[in-house]
């Protein structure tokens, strides 16, 4: 009796493992984007861990020159170097393009907020090749005073022969307790934005 039960469990676990392997690895998969032309929709998404509100993306104001990674807070959105909201956080990118835009967050709480961004991920992952996103996941702790509007100038750069299907880039924004932020700030462990 025990032998039969053991045999059945062994067969079921073998089938389960082979099904799991098939789901995670397709040896016949080979990405081929030849013939793809034109603009590709790229959505910028966010996951929030204790972080209230939402991060939005904006076009840059042409009359206000900015540098990559400029980061600041302002009391009113009109004082930020931005123009229009990018609807659905969706950019359309082409080969060889350099696209700067602004990440914008309004702290509507009564507390100073500290946060960082975990490294971004691309979904589907096969479209993660051929571009560079100079963003906010640079091992840096950011802060926003109550009622303030925080912004950061970022950039996506595609290779001249870049081709893709639509995909999304997702960052996780993690709220940091003020005591932890103070400890990290005292340690002086910051990344440099040019890394």
Summary of predicted features, one role per range:
Residues 5-13:
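Sec-dependent N-terminal signal peptides
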Residues 91-93, 97, 134-161:
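Intrinsically disordered, low-complexity Pro/Gly/Ser/Thr-rich segments with frequent PxxP/GP/PP motifs
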Residues 75-86, 124-139:
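Short beta-strand and strand-turn-strand segments in soluble, beta-rich domains
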Residues 19-82, 100, 183-195:
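Membrane engagement elements in two modes
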Residues 27-28, 96-101, 150-152, 166-168:
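Short, solvent-exposed loop/turn segments enriched in Ser/Thr/Gly
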Residues 104-109, 158:
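Asparagine-centered strand-capping/turn motif at beta-strand->loop junctions
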């Amino acid at each position: 009796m025990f032998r039969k039960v053991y045999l059945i469990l062994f067969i079921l676990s073998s089938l389960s493992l082979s099904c799991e392997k098939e789901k995670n690895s397709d040896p016949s998969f080979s990405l081929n984007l030849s013939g793809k032309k034109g603009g590709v929709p790229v959505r910028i998404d966010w996951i929030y861990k204790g972080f209230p509100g939402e991060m939005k993306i904006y076009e840059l104001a042409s009359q206000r020159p900015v540098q990559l990674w400029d980061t600041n807070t302002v009391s009113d959105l009109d004082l930020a170097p931005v123009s229009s909201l990018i609807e659905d956080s969706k950019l359309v990118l082409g080969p060889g393009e350099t696209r700067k835009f602004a990440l914008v967050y309004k702290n509507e709480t009564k507390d100073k907020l500290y946060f960082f961004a975990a490294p971004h991920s691309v979904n589907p992952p096969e479209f993660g090749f051929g571009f560079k996103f100079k963003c906010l996941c640079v091992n840096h702790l950011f802060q926003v005073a109550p009622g303030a509007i925080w912004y950061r100038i970022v950039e996506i750069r595609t290779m001249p022969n870049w081709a893709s299907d639509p995909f999304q880039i997702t960052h996780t924004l993690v709220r940091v307790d003020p005591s932890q932020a103070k400890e990290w700030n005292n340690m002086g462990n910051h990344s440099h934005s040019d890394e």
